[in-house]
């Protein structure tokens, strides 16, 4: 009966999905705002530290997100106590079907959960939330420990109004009321109450969600999550069909199982990869005969979580013995082949045994780290050669879209989205994993694009782990044109990835490679960073930048958005690693940029003069 139960489980899961098809957390939104009440000598520096949104030294490039949303602040060093500061942050789906963002807080002397919630986070979170999301007892929080601080957020509700798409997470205070918040926000009391049903605005505590304004003072409209997906009715139809099919499979397979129990193994290999990978127990390559001849002890001893072990026979069969017609790419450590394995499209990287360090690096990272903007590892094989099996990402890599021929040019809004997705993937491995990982080979060729033109960071073969905020000394590794200056001395830190990401931002703007051929003469090459640095030195910086913007964009871009991305690229590629922003800052900056760029669609403008005005030309 064990087999029968295992088949019923996914069916029950599908039933639960059917009844919960209208999820409260169908999608995230690029940006939300936190209302931080200033008291007891709180400064922007404190807010910056607690909510991880850098101010200095990047405000010289006029890209500071806090100041953009607080035009009333004339001097960041002198702010009136008792006022509120709006702090932008990403609003993301969290486990448990709700929206929020996890900030990291380093515990200081005399900190308690209550003090952190009230004093350090201005009631944007609660003591109960901190206790629930951190392993430390309330009476013994270690000094310098890192706390996960959840701040909830909202992306709006089109059933209430489509006029509002940016929301402020607003902690209520004793002096607040429904009418006072309506006056200060410019939103009717009825709308506020409908966005916060059942909430008593006069309670003096708790969180409400208030429509917010963009840096131009306008209310961004709600962006429906349905535009890129399918309706609930379609989903319901698909689910019902799948359930019927699974019931039929249950009957056939269980009948065959009872008839011949020896065929149980063939059933195991028929389970879809995504299901099997999610439920595979942690195994060791040393046990169970998984190691093949020639496998090094280091490989044989690695522990693998949630990954499928494939046989060489199965991989060879799926690729016609690794026929060239199945080859879809070639990297520094091996070739990549397309395959269909157990009903799922996959990409197989075949590596020589000499690349065991790179194999282990990818295996260790991708079996422990899971994020929507990181490529998913399905499984591995260590017979004869080293094989890693990934999810197949249909649209190739970013470099192919920017530098290759035969593809439609990426619209500017998609370029900003790809930059934001990639930044979120990197922020995750830099900020939210223990230990912290440094990718060390960020480049456009290692950013994969799916069918919806969303990005996933891939190729973790050079990844190194470091202590939080730390660095390590290693050999210089990476790709020429993307390597930060300090890598010459073997220094590795998260700022190495930041530098390379800055080069990718320049690529998104110009569609040029990281190394540019300046003339037809032999040897006339220059780094893309140098090309942009030269443009920033020109008297007319804007005109100089226009000359290197991808000509395939034509007039279909808002110049202000391009200029701001170029300035962010400049901040990322500063020679001094300490002056580069963190990936957390970059995510907030790009979220802000995407929020303003996403509303811009040149296709809505038929008048050529309007098009020129919008593009800044």
Swiss-Prot record:
Disulphide bonds annotated for this chain are 25-93, 29-155, 91-153
Q: How is it modified after translation?
A: Autophosphorylated. Autophosphorylation is induced by chitin and derivatives.
Give the Extracellular compartment stretches of this protein: 24-232
User: Where's it mainly located?
Assistant: membrane
Q: Which residues are ATP-binding?
A: 328-336, 349
- Description of the deletion phenotype: Complete loss of response to the chitin elicitor, including loss of MAPK activation, generation of reactive oxygen species, and transcriptional activation. Impaired chitin-mediated resistance against biotic and abiotic stresses such as tolerance to salinity, heavy-metal stresses, and Botrytis cinerea infection. Reduced resistance to incompatible fungi such as Erysiphe cichoracearum and Alternaria brassicicola. Enhanced susceptibility to Pseudomonas syringae pv. tomato DC3000 associated with peptidoglycan insensitivity. Impaired chitin-induced phosphorylation of PBL27.
Among the GO biological process terms of this entry, one is: protein autophosphorylation
Listed GO cellular component terms?
plasma membrane
- Where do the TM regions start and end? 233-253
Q: Does the keyword Transmembrane apply?
A: yes
Which tissues show it? Expressed ubiquitously, with lowest expression in pollen.
Outline the extent of the Protein kinase domain: 322-594
Q: Which catalytic residues are annotated?
A: 441
In which residues is chitin bound?
Answer: 109-115, 137-143
Chain positions found as Phosphoserine: 266, 268, 274
Recount the UniProt induction comment for this entry.
Induced upon treatment with chitin oligosaccharide elicitor and flagellin (e.g. flg22).
Q: Which residues carry this modification: Phosphothreonine?
A: 479, 519
- The source's domain of life comes to Eukaryota
Q: What does this protein do?
A: Lysin motif (LysM) receptor kinase that functions as a cell surface receptor in chitin elicitor (chitooligosaccharides) signaling leading to innate immunity toward both biotic and abiotic stresses (e.g. tolerance to salinity, heavy-metal stresses, and Botrytis cinerea infection). Recognizes microbe-derived N-acetylglucosamine (NAG)-containing ligands. Involved in the resistance to pathogenic fungi Alternaria brassicicola and Erysiphe cichoracearum, probably by sensing microbe-associated molecular patterns (MAMP) and pathogen-associated molecular patterns (PAMP).
How is this protein organized at the quaternary level? Forms homodimers and homooligomers. Homodimerization is required to trigger plant defenses. Binds to chitin, chitosan and chito-oligomer oligosaccharide elicitors. Interaction with chitin octamer (NAG(8)) promotes homodimerization while shorter chitin oligomers inhibit homodimerization. Interacts with Pseudomonas syringae hopAB2/avrPtoB. Interacts (preferentially when unphosphorylated) with PBL27 at the plasma membrane. Binds to IOS1.
* Protein family according to the UniProt entry: Belongs to the protein kinase superfamily. Ser/Thr protein kinase family.
This chain belongs to the protein called Chitin elicitor receptor kinase 1
Q: State the organism named in the record.
A: Arabidopsis thaliana
Gene label: CERK1
């Amino acid at each position: 009966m064990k087999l029968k139960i295992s088949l019923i489980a996914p069916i029950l899961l599908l039933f639960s999905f059917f009844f919960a098809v209208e999820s409260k957390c169908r999608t995230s939104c690029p940006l939300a705002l936190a209302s931080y009440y200033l008291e007891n000598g709180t400064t922007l520096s404190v807010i910056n530290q607690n909510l991880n949104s850098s101010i200095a030294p990047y405000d010289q490039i006029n890209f500071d997100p806090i100041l953009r949303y607080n035009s009333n602040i004339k001097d960041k060093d002198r702010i009136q106590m008792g006022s509120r500061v709006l702090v932008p942050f990403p609003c993301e789906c969290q486990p448990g079907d709700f929206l929020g963002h996890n900030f990291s807080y380093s515990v200081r002397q005399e900190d308690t959960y209550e003090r952190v919630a009230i004093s350090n986070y201005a009631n944007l979170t609660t003591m109960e939330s901190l206790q629930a999301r951190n392993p430390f007892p309330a009476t013994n929080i270690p000094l310098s420990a890192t706390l996960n601080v959840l701040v909830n957020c909202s992306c709006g509700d089109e059933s209430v109004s489509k006029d509002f798409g940016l929301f402020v997470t607003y902690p209520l205070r004793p002096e607040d009321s429904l009418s006072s918040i309506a006056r200060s926000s410019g939103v009717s009391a009825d709308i506020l109450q409908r966005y916060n049903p059942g909430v008593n605005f006069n309670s003096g505590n708790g969180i409400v969600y208030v429509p917010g304004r963009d840096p131009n003072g306008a209310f961004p409209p709600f962006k429906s999550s349905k535009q890129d997906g399918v309706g609930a009715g379609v989903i319901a139809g698909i689910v019902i069909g799948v359930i019927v099919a699974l019931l039929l499979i249950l009957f056939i397979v269980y009948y065959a199982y009872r008839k011949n129990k020896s065929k149980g193994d063939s059933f195991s290999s028929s389970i879809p990869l995504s299901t099997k990978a999610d439920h595979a127990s942690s195994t060791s390559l040393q046990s169970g005969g998984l190691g093949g001849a020639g496998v090094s002890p280091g490989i044989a001893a690695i522990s693998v979580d949630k990954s499928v072990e494939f046989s060489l026979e199965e991989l060879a069969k799926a690729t016609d013995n690794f026929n060239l017609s199945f080859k879809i790419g070639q990297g520094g450590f091996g070739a990549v082949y397309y395959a269909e394995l157990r009903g799922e499209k996959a990409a197989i990287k075949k590596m020589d045994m000499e690349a065991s360090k790179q194999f282990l690096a990818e295996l260790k990272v991708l079996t422990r780290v899971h994020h929507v903007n990181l490529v998913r590892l399905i499984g591995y094989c260590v017979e004869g050669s080293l094989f890693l099996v990934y999810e197949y990402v249909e649209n190739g890599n970013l470099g192919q879209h920017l530098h290759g021929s035969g593809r439609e040019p990426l619209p500017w809004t998609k370029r900003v989205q790809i930059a934001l997705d990639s930044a979120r993937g990197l922020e995750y491995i830099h900020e939210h994993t223990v230990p912290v990982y440094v990718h060390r080979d960020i480049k456009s060729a290692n950013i994969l694009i799916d069918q919806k033109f969303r990005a996933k960071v891939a190729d973790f073969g050079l990844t190194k782990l470091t202590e939080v905020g730390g660095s390590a000394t290693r050999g210089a590794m990476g790709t020429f044109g993307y390597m930060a200056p300090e890598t010459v001395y073997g220094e590795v830190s998260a700022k190495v990835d930041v530098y390379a990401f800055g080069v990718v931002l320049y690529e998104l703007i110009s569609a040029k490679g990281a190394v540019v051929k300046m003339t037809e003469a032999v040897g006339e090459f220059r780094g893309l960073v140098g090309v942009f640095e030269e443009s920033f030195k020109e008297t007319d910086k804007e005109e100089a930048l226009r000359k290197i913007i991808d000509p395939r964009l034509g007039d279909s871009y808002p110049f202000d958005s391009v200029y701001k991305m170029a300035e962010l690229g400049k901040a990322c590629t500063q020679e001094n690693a300490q002056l580069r922003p963190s990936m957390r800052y970059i995510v907030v900056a790009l979220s802000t940029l995407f929020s303003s760029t996403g509303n811009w669609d040149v296709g809505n403008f038929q008048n050529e003069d309007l098009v020129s005005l919008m593009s800044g030309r």
